[in-house]
């Protein structure tokens, strides 16, 4: 199961709009780390990773140190906590997918999150725990993050998750909103795949804006 824009939606017009709230946090203010710099430092970190490994998946420490190379581990941790708090404030669960998780659990099926994200597994688990109903969160068996494995879903994260779980591809159904990452890449890995097309793009954007207004 995909995470962002499938299980969790952000109450913003675009995902990067979270950074405009993030730049108001004490940790980011101290460094004058604004939304624009957060975007450019992620791009720089990805370019550097491509040069070094041929792949583009990065972690939060790599992103932060692309902007501020001399950050201490404590400063990195403080920035990550601020970013997690901003995501917790912005994200909400998509009810049909929550019900899908509950239905899977009732049938005795395992639920696994596979996400293209710069969050590591502990941070993503905390985000899920803070935003999902408790029963839905407890139904999640495993979490795989592209940042931890160095591969996006398009680059082979599905196959690495299967290898870790020791299950055959055809025993798995992957559900997600992104046609390339969640449908095509999962199919290439041998999984059953379902493309969760929520709405026409203008409707999805309107729902995000409504969520922002309601919050």
Spell out what each predicted region is.
Residues 18-82:
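A metal-dependent, Asp-based hydrolase signature
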Residues 1-12:
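Asp-based phosphoryl-transfer active-site loop
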Residues 90-91, 122, 132, 157-160, ...:
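A generic "structured core" feature
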Residues 154-180:
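Conserved Lys-Pro-Asp/Glu-containing loop-to-beta segment of HAD-superfamily phosphomonoesterases
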């Amino acid at each position: 199961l995909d995470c962002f824009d499938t299980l969790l939606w952000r109450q913003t017009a675009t995902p990067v709009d979270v950074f405009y709230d993030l730049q108001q946090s004490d940790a980011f203010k101290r460094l004058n780390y604004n939304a624009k710099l957060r975007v450019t430092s992620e791009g720089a970190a990805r370019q550097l990773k491509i040069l070094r490994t041929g792949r583009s998946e990065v972690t939060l420490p790599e992103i932060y140190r692309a902007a501020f190379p001399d950050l201490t581990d404590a400063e990195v941790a403080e920035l990550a906590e601020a970013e997690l708090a901003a995501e917790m404030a912005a994200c909400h669960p998509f009810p049909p997918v929550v019900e899908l998780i509950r239905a899977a659990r009732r049938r005795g099926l395992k639920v696994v999150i596979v996400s293209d994200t710069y969050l590591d597994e502990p941070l993503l688990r905390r985000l899920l725990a803070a935003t999902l109903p408790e029963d839905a969160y407890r139904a999640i068996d495993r979490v795989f993050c592209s940042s931890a494995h160095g591969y996006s879903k398009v680059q082979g994260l599905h196959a690495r998750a299967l290898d870790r779980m020791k299950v055959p591809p055809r025993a798995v159904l992957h559900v997600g909103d992104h046609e390339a990452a969640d449908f095509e890449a999962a199919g290439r890995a041998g999984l059953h795949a379902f493309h969760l097309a929520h709405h026409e793009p203008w409707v999805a954007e309107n729902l995000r804006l409504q969520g922002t207004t309601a919050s």
